[in-house]
Each structure stands twice: as C-alpha cells, then as structure tokens.
A protein has these predicted regions:
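Bacterial N-terminal signal peptides
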Residues: 5-15
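Transmembrane beta-barrel domains of Gram-negative outer membranes and organellar outer membranes
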Residues: 20-287
Length: 287
C-alpha cells in the first residue's frame, strides 16, 4: 500500500513538471505519456475569416471541445485521438459550391473529422543529437460535407519527429525545448474520382521555460501542396504561426495562444484556450 501511494504521488507530481506537451501547439513532441496513464486536453478555438474552398463558404469559426487524448502503452509507444466535438461557422460570404449543401441562414455547424494515430519514440536524445520518433495515423470521415465545413474523406499521414533540449536546467528540465516535424500526408480529393493529393507536412516549435510554472511557446505548422498546379478542392496548402503560453497550477496545465494564417486558404487570425490533465496510473498495459 505504501508503495502504491508513493507511486501515485510521483506520477501526480510529474503532471506538474512534465515538459513539452502539445497544447496549444500543433507540432508533435517526442515525449511519451507514462504507460498506463492518460493525458486529456480540451480547448476552444476562435478563427476569423476561415475558408472552406469545397463549399465556397467563408466566415468566422468557433471550435468547441477541441479534444486531444494521449495514452501510453509502453515506455516508447503512445496512442492518440484528437478532434473537435462541434464546429460552428458564422457565414460572412458564400461563393460557388462544388458539392450540394444543406445550409440555411447565416450559420452552419458540424462534428469534426477525428484523427487516430500512434507515436513511437525510436531514439533517446544525447548530448549532441536529438531524440527521434515516428508518428502515423489516419483521419476518419466523420463530418457531413453538406454542412459546408468538413470534407468527409479518409486521409492518412506519417511524420518524423525530432526534439532537442538546450540551456541551463530549471528544476529537472533544460530551459529550451525545440521540436521539428516533417512528413507526408495523403489526402483524398473529395470531387475527383481515383485522385489524391500528396502534401508535405511540416512543423517547427519551441518551448521556453520562463519559470517553474510558466512556459512561452511558439511554432509554425502546416501542409504544402506538392502539385505543380492548383491543389484539388479540399486539399489546399494551409499553415499557422502561433505564439502563446502554458501555465501549470493545481495539477493542471492551462494554455492560450494567438494564431496567424500563413497561406491564402488559412484563417486570417485566431485565438485558442485550453487545459490539460495528466492522470495517475489507471491501467496496466499488456506485455
């Protein structure tokens, strides 16, 4: 019993000190959730001038319940599920639509296309070389394309993750944590039969530990169309620059960030707020 209590306390303390967690970043880190524990994050996003080329809709989008769940199954293996419970768009304009729509009035809403993925840490960081990992997964077709927000297609992706920590140690963690992602996404073209678009995935992020409880975070993240001409509708290049903060308090990590679009198909600006909780050990993975 004493050993059990000490173990639970140790894991609870690690929730306060764990570095390089995702929210509010979109760039993946290399850190693995402790085996048998779950990290649960939820947030709200607000975007101005969001574009949906497939439906021709432009408007201000609110994402309610941006959920990210990470579960460790081994010291170097983690499963993830992420998506938004409900997307709302206040329509500012409607251009020509490539698909039939079921939209009335000046707003629309829909469920999100959820993503399921696995992350594997392949190599630990050394004094000179970064840690290396691999993430792969797929996006499920959960949306109703007639609502004008999602594309309701299956998309798959894989990416390589690099991470290196620098600087003097604060507590048990170096002050600066740099993360990089590079990968390939295969996106189904919604209105072109037997067609896909292979997009280049990228992400570069940094987390600066200002104090024991406050981090400053920033990143660029997105995808790039690899075709010589225009991308098939619904697979265009998008990207964001984000800058924000993470604050640890009361066993939780709160976050906030501002977002700025990097391409003509990205939302112009936005803000995101969220909270993350790391559970104690709740199950024992199979061996």
């Amino acid at each position: 019993m004493r050993l059990l209590i000490l173990t639970v306390l140790a894991i609870a303390i690690s929730a306060l000190t764990a570095p390089a967690q995702q929210r509010p970043l979109m760039t993946d880190d290399i850190d693995i959730t402790p085996a048998g524990s779950m990290e649960i994050a939820a947030g709200v996003d607000f975007y101005q001038n969001a574009k949906f080329p497939l439906s021709g809709i432009r408007g201000d989008m609110t994402r309610i319940g941006d959920i990210r769940i990470r579960t460790g199954f081994a010291a170097n293996v983690e499963l993830q599920i992420e998506g938004t419970i409900q997307n709302y768009v206040a329509i500012n304009s409607m251009g020509p639509s490539a698909i039939p729509l079921n939209v009335s009035g000046n707003s629309t809403n829909d469920f999100d296309d959820f993503t399921i993925s696995a992350k594997v840490k392949l190599r630990n960081e050394t004094r000179l070389l970064p840690a290396v990992g691999l993430k792969f997964g797929y996006q499920m077709p959960n949306t109703d394309q007639a609502r004008g927000i999602g594309t309701n297609q299956v998309n798959i992706f894989t990416k390589i993750i690099l991470q290196k920590k620098f600087g003097d140690v604060v507590g048990t963690t170096p002050r600066f944590n740099a993360m990089g992602n590079i990968g390939l996404g295969i996106m189904t073209a919604p209105i072109e039969r037997f067609t896909q678009n292979d997009v280049f995935l990228y992400g570069l992020a940094g987390i600066y530990r200002a104090s024991d409880h406050v981090n400053i975070v920033s990143e660029v993240n997105g995808r790039i169309n690899t075709r010589n001409g225009p991308a098939p509708l619904g697979t265009e290049s998008i990207g964001q620059f984000r800058v924000g903060t993470q604050i640890r308090a009361s066993g939780l990590r709160f976050d906030a960030a501002a977002a700025f679009g990097l391409t003509s198909f990205s939302p112009r600006t936005g803000v995101t707020f969220g909270v993350t909780y790391l559970s104690p050990h709740i199950f024992t993975p199979a061996r």
